[in-house]
Amino acid sequence: TSTDYFISGFDWPVDGVITGVYGSQRILNGKPRQPHFGIDIAAPTGTPIKASAAGKVVMADDLYFSGWTIIISHGDYLSSTYSHLQEITVQSGDYVNQGKMIGVVGNTGRSTGPHLDWRINWLDKRLDPQLIANKHP
């Protein structure tokens, strides 16, 4: 059976300024690349990041492009991804409550400044967090 850890909705994982929106076109070396499938939230390095909804940490690792990255499974094939962290404070297999600190804002991987790249995923689809999350603080 599946547990719906997202029953209370999704909270914003960090307070900050939205600097990149879902679906925006990315340009790399002057060439268009695939659209951005998350939102970028700028905040100072070291700003705490909280789990947007309860769930199980299914990945916490340092990846080439996204730097320190966490994926939390919320049940029913729904997950959230947090990338470019400076530090992670959870590990794969941990269960987290909504609002638990999972890491801090950083500038790791392919990044141009300290921010959180936050994504919500359903199966292999990416969803716009701004349409799903509770009101932005």
Predicted regions: what is each one?
Residues 1-7, 15:
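Surface-exposed beta-loop interaction hotspot
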